[in-house]
């Protein structure tokens, strides 16, 4: 996970989020979906998914704004000094990173692509952690077919989140595009260790993902040498998350406000 996404995760229906009340436990779990959930957790252990059952009443889910209001209020009260831009990107990033990682991991590890419309994310002390999905048959097929399905799911989900957030926070479209792009490429970086993708493959796949989502150029990669001299990649982020404006914050190691040399120095220091 990237430094900014680690901060997020810590240790088409009506736009918005809803409190889930209508689900019922089911013994008829879908095996394809179960496999996808296992794959996701094998890459990111905190990405714990369940199918069926009833998620907590305060879970984030497409359809109404109640839980999103609570998320906004939590972070506004926790760090009022960080400002409006921090608040907007914090809420957006927290709401979208898990479904984005789930979809990208599914595509690259040959899993079936889940539908995101019914996804609910339990929230604890301001952090969505894990998720619930209704029992359903995810989309299988060739790599291209699964990538197209995943892009459509992510685009619909993220657009709905953004529509719901805009009345609540100061969210600019370009910044939102760039944060979404960062999450997608962060997921690609995370899954790379579980594949045979070369650096060139990762760069090409990153461009393909962002193009499929209509956010081309929103994030990229830069190459550097690790401490042992081996080539490495890091995210070339295009938007600052404003974490440094918090009373306990500092600039992320790959913050676009840092020079390239400073970003590389931070990455090397973190690896030591």
Regions found by a protein language model. Name each.
Residues 1-88:
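Generic N-terminal leader/targeting and pre-domain segments
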Residues 60-232:
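Hydrophobic, aromatic-lined core segments that form the binding pocket/scaffold
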Residues 65, 262-263:
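Short alpha-helical interface patches
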Residues 107, 192, 253, 267-268:
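Short linear functional motifs in flexible/disordered or boundary regions
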Residues 187-190, 194, 247, 258, ...:
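Hydrophobic alpha-helical segments
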Residues 222-234, 239-245, 269-272:
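Active-site-proximal "nucleotidyltransferase
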Residues 237-260:
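Local cysteine-cluster metal-coordination motifs and their immediate loop/turn environment
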Residues 257-262, 268-272:
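Short cysteine/histidine-rich metal-coordination sites, predominantly Zn2+-binding motifs
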């Amino acid at each position: 996970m990237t430094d900014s996404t680690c901060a997020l995760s810590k240790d088409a229906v009506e736009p918005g989020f809803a409190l889930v009340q209508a689900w019922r436990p089911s013994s008829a779990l879908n095996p394809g979906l179960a496999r996808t959930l296992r794959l996701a957790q094998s890459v990111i252990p905190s990405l714990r998914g369940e199918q069926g059952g009833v998620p907590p009443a305060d879970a984030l889910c497409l359809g109404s704004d109640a839980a999103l209001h609570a998320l906004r209020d939590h972070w506004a009260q926790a760090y009022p000094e960080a400002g409006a831009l921090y608040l907007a990107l914090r809420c957006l990033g927290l709401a979208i990173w898990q479904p984005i990682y789930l979809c990208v991991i599914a595509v690259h590890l040959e899993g079936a692509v889940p539908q995101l419309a019914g996804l609910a994310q339990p929230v604890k002390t301001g952090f969505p952690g894990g998720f619930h999905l209704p029992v359903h048959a995810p989309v299988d097929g060739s790599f291209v077919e699964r990538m197209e399905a995943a892009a459509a799911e992510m685009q619909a989900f993220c657009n709905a989140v953004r529509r719901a957030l805009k009345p609540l926070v100061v969210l600019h479209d370009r910044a939102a595009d760039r944060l979404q792009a960062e999450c997608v490429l962060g997921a690609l970086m995370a899954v790379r260790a579980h594949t045979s993708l070369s650096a060139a493959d990762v760069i090409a796949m990153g461009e393909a993902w962002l193009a499929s989502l209509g956010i081309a150029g929103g994030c990229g990669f830069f190459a550097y040498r690790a401490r042992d001299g081996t080539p490495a990649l890091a995210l070339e982020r295009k938007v600052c998350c404003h974490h440094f404006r918090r009373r306990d914050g500092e600039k992320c190691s790959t913050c676009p406000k840092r020079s390239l040399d400073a970003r590389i120095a931070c990455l090397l220091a973190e690896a030591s």
